[in-house]
Amino acid sequence: MILRLLLLFISLILLGSCDKVIHKNGARAQNALDSMIEQYSYPENDNFTSKRVNNKEDIIGNWVGSFNVPQSYMNAYIFDDGRQPWHIEDKINISIQHIEENRVDGISIIAGTIRPLKGTIQETENGFDIILVEPGREQYDGTYHLFIDSRTSMIRGTWLAYKDIVLKERNLSLKKRFFNYNPLIPMERVSIRNDISLFRNIRMRSEYRELYNAIKSHSQQVYEINPSISIIDPYEAESLSGNDLMLLRNIIFAKHGYAFKKRPLRIYFESQPWYIPVSTNVKNELTYIEKENIKTILRYEKYNEYHSDY
């Protein structure tokens, strides 16, 4: 009898402790959410606007747009090694970070890879001519020849590889974009496209094909759950498919401007108008809510993977 009472007493203490932890974490998450709503609730996100270029200072910032091969390269065969851009890429980011007299410094962000840039700038009658060079140590390094038209505030130009790679030339068309982390911004429903050369001209890892199929078969819940502002509880996570969990986890990283190496994820998020690749490491930028959700999602992804083997 005494033993039973003792066990009951211990159980009540443990339940009380758990309840305090739950309330403490819940309050912490709610405080984080309230702070986010106050901070990020504004009518329009700055990164949808494009700034006029009137002088060199206006050029500093992120220039985002297409990085595509000329038509003559469209049927070329390539192997996706996780570093090379494909024939068609929707979003390259040429980030101009510093201009001093006629010298320019910055970085290029494409296909989950960041490369340093150095070069020169020359003012012309209708804009600015810019030449930017990558170091040349990597297989896919090259030179950018760009023109900023002050009448349209757009960059157009070309990229030429140093080495004799399969896709040696590229055309660029870029607009200035302003990156702002906004956890409240919703996901838009998009369908992942199949490039003309997707399976015919590309040799890729088997995991990429699986990833394409996963992205194409997610549910409506991906658009209803915002993993940056609300805690995903175990009951909710258990009801989600492995595909849903994978996308929700990566939505968190995309909102921080993570530059995806895996092309299926890249083209999915590049279809979102708010997405801008700015970094290959955003772990230090994650909020408390996002970190908690990533832990939960990873746990249930492993659970789904384990049970799919049986």
Which residue stretches match the model-derived regions?
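Sec-dependent N-terminal signal peptides
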Residues: L5-I13
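Beta-sheet ligand-binding and adhesion/scaffold domains
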Residues: I22-F79, R83-N93, I107-T113, L117-S206
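Amphipathic alpha-helical packing elements
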Residues: E236-P277
